[in-house]
């Protein structure tokens, strides 16, 4: 019988999901994106060659895998064509192996214009979006005014809807934000110059998934961003615009929650965050700078430096609750090599003196929160590219064990380098 496994970030994103998805895709028939858009940046390194995927599922690098983009993904036609072009230039067959739900909302130039205008207007209070139009596209979806992939099949009706939407957006862009309007004809022409390519990949993703389940094949759901950026459960309002958690699998693909067999949460051995928002264990000293340097902590999509801090078991406990996580993959263990001591945040001290073991929901409730740390000895030995558990230093094993105890979930996979081969699978999610 086939297994259905979801892989998602259990922190603030950038945990290393792309590598692990790619690692496990040799076991599956389908890899599915179910939320987000081209704001994701999944970095894969295979035999030393680096690939960054933003929209197309990471399974595209395996010839035997069919990649699906579910209805929960907001689709930029421009970004899709650019990414397809990059892959096809390397000889990768995308068009025959990528299927797209007709219910995907489209990201169009006015979404990007609005995203930039709003962030500029917010100034120092900006959310820290990637500026790719993700939020405005999801707004249109919820407001029931958005254009979807299915609208590409009728150009006349599409043009009529586009005109109404542009009137709405351009009024705000010109009169409120004082920026240039988006041109109707150029937008229409640009979309329909590539519409036929997209239409050729449209499929009933939900039916494909349920048939795959019946046929007993393995399916992998690839999450983007991280749990603490979820629109409902993250550090609101400093969040993304989609459900990054396990519940998003069902709503973003039409694959019911009872069909998931295993949820793999990806965690770094420390914590990072990009953009604004609360981050209790953030380090502002030389240790934080050294983690950032050794971990090469710069965003795959934006290039922005990531904020770095100690492992936060409080935030990860919340991720375990929300996602029903079955097991963890811990990445970047090797980045902690050489530190004399390491700290793990085990609880938060709230401004009123209360000690809590689960993270608050809203960003405002994190104000004045202090981390309570447990200090553990570090290790001087090298863990980079170690692929056998017994070859890890005892202090590293103790560190992993303590995290397992604090969050109540086992570490089933360990990553000790960026390449897919630099990994230990202690318990295979597809055999669990």
From Swiss-Prot:
Subcellular location as annotated: Cytoplasm
Recorded catalytic activity of this chain's protein: IMP + L-aspartate + GTP = N(6)-(1,2-dicarboxyethyl)-AMP + GDP + phosphate + 2 H(+)
Active site per UniProt: 14 (proton acceptor), 42 (proton donor)
Pathway(s) where this gene product acts: Purine metabolism; AMP biosynthesis via de novo pathway; AMP from IMP: step 1/2
Residues that, per the record, bind GTP: 13-19, 41-43, 306, 332-334, 415-417
Any one cellular-component term (Gene Ontology): cytoplasm
Keyword GTP-binding part of the UniProt annotation: yes
Binding residue positions for Mg(2+): 14, 41
Entry's cofactor comment: Binds 1 Mg(2+) ion per subunit.
One Pfam family in the UniProt entry: Adenylsucc_synt
Enzyme class: ligase
Protein family membership: Belongs to the adenylosuccinate synthetase family.
Its job: Plays an important role in the de novo pathway of purine nucleotide biosynthesis. Catalyzes the first committed step in the biosynthesis of AMP from IMP.
Subunit structure comment from the entry: Homodimer.
HAMAP family the UniProt entry points to: Adenylosucc_synth
Protein name: Adenylosuccinate synthetase
GN (gene name): purA
